[in-house]
Design a protein with these regions (language model features):
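Short glycine/proline- and acidic residue-enriched helix-loop micro-motifs
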Residues: 147-156
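C-terminal non-catalytic regions of proteins with extracellular/luminal or membrane-system context
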Residues: 29, 40, 74-75, 105-116, ...
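Aromatic-residue hotspot detector
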Residues: 15, 60, 138, 203-206
C-alpha cells in the first residue's frame, strides 16, 4: 500500500470514527504500508500500526484479529521468518486472534520458551472473552427458534430491502429510449426471461425487438495468480477479479452486434468500477446496478420507479488513466467517463 498523494492520515478517518463508536474488532489488512513506518512489513506484523497507532494514538482496546492465513499463506514482508517467528512477531506487534490459522503448538512452545509471556496471552484472552460476555454467550448461548419468524425475513424487512435495491440503481445514459412502455417487444440477454415476460413481449430475434436489453456482470478478466501452492489460495484466485477494468473481446463484440439499430440498453453490474466508454457510445440506455434482483431492474426499465441512485465512485475513461492516478486519492483519474456522484433520472 503506497501513499503518493500523502493521504495516509485521510485513510484513518473511518477508523477513528468507528473506534469512537465502541468498535469491538479490527482486522488489519494484508498489505505493507510502504514508507509509513520504521519497517516495511504487513500490518499484522507491524508494531507501529497495531501498538503505536491503534492502541496508543487512537486509544483502541478491542480485539485485533488477523486477516486469513497471515502465518502460513500471505505473510508479506516477513517471508524469510519461520512459522514460529511469524507467530512471535505478530503477537508482539499486537495481534489478539488469528484468522484461518489453527496450529496452537507454536504458541505453546513460544510461551514455554519464554519468548511470549502468559501476561501477554492473557491480554488477548481478556479482550476476546469480554466480547463474548457482553453478547451474553455464556449466560444464554441459544437462539429462541420461535422468535426467528418474527425477526428474520419479515415482510417489512423484505420491503425495505427491495426499496434499497430500487434506490441504488444509477441511470447513466438515456437517449430517449427509457422508460420502456409496458408490453414493448424486448430481446433479453443475461436477465431472467420469466421476469421479463411480466413487463414486455419477449422475442427471440433482436431485430424484431423494440429494445435489446443486455446485462453484463462485474468485469472479470481472468484469474489473478495466487503465487502460492495452496488449495485455498488457488480457490480464492478464482473468486476475485484482476486489475484490468476493460470488458473482454467477446462481450464487446456482442455489444457491437446488438447496437447496430440504436435500441440497445446495457445494464452493467458495478460491484467494482469498469471501463464503460465504448459501451456508452454503443448504447441508447446505460444503467449501473449493485447486485439487485432482475425484477427490480425490469421495474426500473419500465418506469415503475424513477432511478435516483448516484455513483459511489468515478468511472474511469481508460486503464491508462487508472494507472496514472495516485493510489491513495479517490476520484482523481483524468477525464473520467462519469464522475463520483453522477446519476440522472427520467
Amino acid at each position: 500500500q503506497i501513499y503518493p498523494g500523502g493521504n495516509f492520515e485521510y485513510h484513518l478517518l473511518p477508523f477513528k470514527e468507528a473506534i469512537k463508536n465502541n468498535l469491538k474488532v479490527i482486522m488489519p489488512y494484508y498489505g505493507i504500508p510502504v514508507g509509513q513506518t520504521d519497517e516495511d512489513v504487513a500490518m499484522a506484523f507491524n508494531s507501529y500500526i497495531l501498538k503505536d497507532l491503534l492502541r496508543e494514538e487512537l486509544n483502541y482496546d478491542g480485539v485485533i484479529c488477523s486477516d486469513w492465513g497471515i502465518i502460513t499463506g500471505r505473510h508479506w514482508g516477513v517471508d524469510e521468518l519461520s512459522i514460529e517467528q511469524r507467530y512471535e512477531k505478530s503477537i508482539k506487534a499486537g495481534i489478539d486472534q488469528y484468522g484461518g490459522e489453527k496450529d496452537t503448538d507454536y504458541l505453546i512452545d513460544l510461551v514455554k520458551d519464554g519468548q511470549i509471556t502468559e501476561v501477554r496471552i492473557n491480554e488477548s484472552v481478556r479482550r476476546i472473552l469480554l466480547n463474548k460476555f457482553e453478547l451474553g454467550l455464556f449466560d444464554n448461548p441459544y437462539v429462541n427458534e420461535e422468535l426467528v419468524q418474527y425477526k428474520v425475513n419479515t415482510q417489512d424487512n423484505i420491503e425495505a430491502g427491495l426499496e434499497a435495491q430500487r434506490k441504488s440503481i444509477v441511470l447513466l445514459e438515456n437517449n430517449g429510449i427509457l422508460p420502456l412502455k409496458k408490453g414493448s417487444k424486448i430481446f433479453v440477454d443475461g436477465l431472467s426471461e420469466e421476469e421479463a415476460r411480466e413487463f414486455g413481449e419477449l422475442v427471440k430475434d433482436p431485430d424484431d425487438a423494440d429494445a435489446v436489453i443486455m446485462y453484463i456482470h462485474t468485469v472479470f478478466n481472468g484469474n489473478q495468480e495466487s503465487g502460492l501452492n495452496r488449495a485455498f489460495d488457488n480457490f480464492l484466485s478464482t473468486l476475485f477479479p484482476n486489475g484490468d477494468l476493460n470488458f473482454n473481446k467477446e462481450i464487446n463484440k456482442k455489444i457491437e452486434a446488438y447496437s447496430n439499430e440504436k435500441k440497445l440498453i446495457v445494464v452493467v453490474d458495478l460491484n467494482r468500477p469498469a471501463i464503460l466508454k465504448s459501451i456508452k457510445e454503443s448504447s441508447s440506455g446505460l444503467i449501473g446496478t449493485f447486485g439487485v434482483q432482475d425484477r427490480i431492474i425490469f421495474e426500473g426499465l419500465f418506469g415503475e420507479f424513477n432511478p435516483s441512485g448516484k455513483l459511489p465512485f468515478e468511472i474511469p475513461s481508460s486503464m491508462e488513466s487508472v494507472l496514472n492516478q495516485k493510489e491513495d486519492l479517490p476520484d482523481d483519474s483524468a477525464n473520467p467517463t462519469y464522475e463520483f456522484g453522477y446519476g440522472i433520472s427520467y
